[in-house]
Swiss-Prot record:
One of the primary rRNA binding proteins, it binds directly to 16S rRNA where it nucleates assembly of the body of the 30S subunit. Residues 1-16 have a biased composition (Basic and acidic residues). The keyword Cell division does not apply. Residues 94-157 form the S4 RNA-binding domain. It comes from the Bacteria. Part of the 30S ribosomal subunit. Contacts protein S5. The interaction surface between S4 and S5 is involved in control of translational fidelity. GO terms for molecular function: rRNA binding; structural constituent of ribosome. This is Small ribosomal subunit protein uS4. HAMAP family: Ribosomal_uS4_B (MF_01306_B). NCBIfam families: PRK05327.1 (NF003717), rpsD_bact (TIGR01017). The keyword Glycosyltransferase does not apply.
Length: 205
């Protein structure tokens, strides 16, 4: 397990929310943040604080993305026509590691990034080892033949902990997924409320 994967519950504690809906999240047992001072009652956040929190939560959800990478994604969303907040969600959900996670090929977003980085996945028959690779509607994502018997894959597919959203069509017997369409915010099965509009406000200050 990588350091970034082992930090996933730190993100939950920092946010004070079980952002992936995981049964073992420590925030299911307590309502305070990490560290010895976490039990102190938190004061009301300023508008800036609320916006920053929304940004940190969205960054954390997709594997604790680096600020530079997240900002670049936002800038692209802002350049595109339409609602920037919806564009942002669409771009994040189009990431290869996000699709591998949504398809239930692996149990966590962190595991999805590592799985892709280690070369276990193909897109339209071509091996891709970049988690941030952006998929297009109609792309076919498949677990490579030699990787289909990995324990992490078999265990994840067997779990009924989360459903596959309807914008991804999956055949778990063949370990193949099709990215049917780019989703909207309302389509995405977040375990907690995500507020991308606050992220837009944060970067528009």
């Amino acid at each position: 397990m990588s350091k970034r994967e082992s930090s996933k519950y730190k993100i939950d504690r920092r946010m004070g929310e079980n952002i992936w809906g995981r049964p073992k999240s420590p925030v299911n047992r307590r309502e305070y943040g990490p560290g010895q001072h976490g039990q102190r009652r938190k004061g009301k956040l300023s508008d800036f604080g609320v916006q920053l929190r929304a940004k940190q939560k969205l960054k954390g959800y997709y594997g604790d993305l680096r600020e530079k990478q997240f900002r670049a994604t936002f800038d692209e969303a802002n350049r595109r026509k339409g609602d920037t907040s919806e564009n942002l969600i669409g771009l994040l959900e189009s990431r290869l590691d996000a699709i591998v996670y949504r398809a239930k090929f692996v149990p966590t977003v962190f595991a999805a990034r590592q799985f892709v980085n280690h070369g276990h996945v193909t897109v339209n028959g071509v091996r891709v080892n970049i988690g941030s690779y952006r998929c297009k509607a109609g792309d076919v994502i498949e677990v490579r033949e030699k990787s289909k018997q990995l324990v992490i894959v078999l265990e994840s597919v067997s779990l009924a902990e989360r459903d596959v959203p309807d914008y991804i069509e999956v055949d778990h017997n063949k370990m193949v997924a099709t990215f049917a369409r780019v989703p909207t915010l309302a389509d995405v099965p977040y375990a907690v409320v995500m507020e991308p509009q606050l992220v837009v406000e944060f970067y528009s200050r």
